[in-house]
């Protein structure tokens, strides 16, 4: 079988820095996933949108929620919310996208290295240690880059580290199925290093909070 390996060259890391213009929702197809219609919305899989002003008895399942776009077409997109059997209509609904800024000069990335906790269920009748897996810890995400204090993405990283606020991030691989990872994280540290006849380097450590969505 030929290799299906993905080249890392061309990968992009982005950080949320605001919001874009709201797009009008003209249709809602309940189910799992939920499919929404919005003419020429311009979203990409992995984008993040916040819903408002949808109507129907179960509109609260979407209104006010910030969700990851998946399975997009020119005029529709889906979100991973199970609305099977629910009543949600377009009304004057909108989807407002989160605006992301690319972090430039990245040399390498690593992470998504978490693991589930172990729950010890051994008792006096056990003949060997017994365990269940608990909640999954999504781990960390680290980027190594050449420092540029004028780069808007690097500025946003530093600002997030100072504020301690949670931020949305995207890792966009250059190819492959579901190439975009979207996640929330806290920038724990942004460090700099240098030496004789060297480029000034920077490293950012991001603690992931919650699930990672590939789309």
Show the residue positions of the predicted features.
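Small/polar beta-strand repeat architecture
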Residues: 2-8, 15-47, 52-124
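Intrinsic-disorder/low-complexity, polar/charged segments enriched in Ser/Thr/Lys/Arg/Asp/Glu/Gln
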Residues: 33, 138-142, 166-168, 182, ...
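Short structured motifs
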Residues: 126-130, 189-191
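Oligomerization/assembly interface segments of phage tail-like spikes and tubes
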Residues: 130-149, 198-212
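Short beta-strand and beta-hairpin "edge-sheet" elements
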Residues: 172-215
